Amino acid sequence: RSSDLFPLAIFTGQIAAALAAGNSVLAKPAEQTPLIAAQGVAILLEAGVPPGVIQLLPGRGETVGAALTTDERVRGVMFTGSTEVATLLQRNIASRLDPQGRPTPLIAETGGMNAMIVDSSALTEQVVIDVLASAFDSAGQRCSALRVLCLQEEVADHTLTMLRGAMSECRMGNPGRLTTDIGPVIDAEAKENIERHIQAMRAKGRTVYQAVRENSEDAREWRHGTFVPPTLIELDSFDELKKEVFGPVLHVVRYNRNELDKLVGKPSSS
């Protein structure tokens, strides 16, 4: 099962790996991206992959995905998506053995709290450039996107002032235009989940900052699309985050220099 981020690259990469290892493939794309998946399979067939070796199975995870992963004829699963779903898959196939007594392998790429730690020696301008690119490109819909920015207390205010200013210059709209910095999130459900998280942080008293450049052409698109403006949320501690927020939301945690050793282990345990 591939993800809705980079829906052609990840999808065909998983297929190619399985084919190279001598397997036939039942390819289920994310339910949001069936058309690009169909095009990818058509290209593979045109390139010479035998028709019986790869089958495209679009549909919802709860139906098509569940049927695939519970079928004993499926001898291996590759998955890109949430940690919760990967854990469920692991439980479903953990006790399944083939006729030779071998377990069913699961290869899963899931979420996490990607962090950047900035100390007082960092060049602020470079930090802001890198943060904007990592946190907000592709509307934050990347496994590698920055989720938590850890700022040493001595440089936090200056860095945040510059970062807020840069966010206010970003254009949000149709990603087909070269002038656009931030496009929509994948669907209405994703938008609702992100907005629910932002509202929950506001309710806890956390400082929330949202800004994009005002533009009448962009604003018309905002009303009809699943747009979430780039968002900055200041937290009291890293431990407030329990799961990855998959969108253009950056969390900020301040730290003192003598706390650095303890901070370094937080992202790895998330």
Question: Where do the PLM segments sit?
Answer:
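Short alpha-helical
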Residues: 6, 32-35, 62-63, 83-84, ...
